[in-house]
């Protein structure tokens, strides 16, 4: 029996219809966050896809010291709280240090551990203490079976509901590849698995002072992952990704999201037919 994580009226499981985790890479301000949330709530309601809003208050691992990091934790959580109350949608956002976990848990339903920090024991323990769902992005440097150690840490710290996310593996310099076997291997740990279709096309540091990406492959990888069978699809979106403050080359254009989701629903249905 595959593990199912319950969040309000949403059920997240590898054998269930996929949940969509989406939003802009970073919080750019209240008006932009509300604009994006409204569009995404309407679209996912129309397509009957369970929806969790994602955006980050701080991009703490920017390539360059000059990279825009975000609005900060205080303002960011205030904006996410507004999104949550106005649109009645669950929230996931990143935490980068133990000191951020308690405050973030007052707003977010899911605490996300960034890939670079997935083995940081103190951070995992601090996230666990909040009692929230903990979503860990598999490090680009880790084998999928190594996530068993992350799972053991979290369960030792008392976490009942864990989500793992595949976001590509390092393949030489400035490049990632997606090994679709990772999805099945992590699912064998009896943890719901999410595929991050946009960060998987990153070219880390590929633009010298910032990260590049190959947006044209997002749909292809999303289809492949959905064909394997996943609990959730993670895609960052923006109305104008080429002018976004971070991860623009990877993010999907908002106007293109509906057509992709319609296709993914078909793949998902076929994959999970009994």
Swiss-Prot record:
GO terms for biological process: keto-3-deoxy-D-manno-octulosonic acid biosynthetic process. InterPro entries: Aldolase_TIM (IPR013785), DAHP1/KDSA (IPR006218), KDO8P_synthase (IPR006269). One of its GO terms (cellular component) is cytoplasm. It catalyses: D-arabinose 5-phosphate + phosphoenolpyruvate + H2O = 3-deoxy-alpha-D-manno-2-octulosonate-8-phosphate + phosphate. It is an enzyme of class 2 (transferase). It holds the Pfam family DAHP_synth_1. It comes from the Bacteria. It is found in: Cytoplasm. Pathway: Carbohydrate biosynthesis; 3-deoxy-D-manno-octulosonate biosynthesis; 3-deoxy-D-manno-octulosonate from D-ribulose 5-phosphate: step 2/3; Bacterial outer membrane biogenesis; lipopolysaccharide biosynthesis. Its EC number is 2.5.1.55. The keyword Cytoplasm applies. GO terms for molecular function: 3-deoxy-8-phosphooctulonate synthase activity. Keywords: Cytoplasm, Lipopolysaccharide biosynthesis, Transferase. PANTHER family: PHOSPHO-2-DEHYDRO-3-DEOXYHEPTONATE ALDOLASE. Belongs to the KdsA family. NCBIfam families: KDO8P_synth, PRK05198.1. This is 2-dehydro-3-deoxyphosphooctonate aldolase. It comes from Rickettsia rickettsii (strain Sheila Smith). The gene is kdsA.
